Amino acid sequence: MAPQIFVVQTTLPSTWIEPEVGAFAQSLLEAGAACIQHSSIRSTYRWEGKIESSEEWRLELKVSQEAVDGVLSALRKQHPYSTPQITYWKAESSQEYADWVDSA
């Protein structure tokens, strides 16, 4: 079986500026994430009976199996949305990358 890591995704408000997103990401690194990529996206979704479209920040985290519970707990505790998108799954990776994620 190929080595596995966790990939975690969430979104943050577009009203946040880059340093705020960076500080949020830093707190998740301190909670155990190995790597966090963030980028600006446009989301279209249903909210309170209406179809909405807005810009947001997407964060994608790479996390070891040992650290995932702590990272998810920190993410839930610190997230600014009342109903945050927090999705996560196991992903196969190269042995070298999994080793790096585990050691980060």
Regions found by a protein language model. Give the residues of each.
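Positively charged, small/polar-rich N-terminal and surface patches that mediate targeting and assembly
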Residues: 1-104
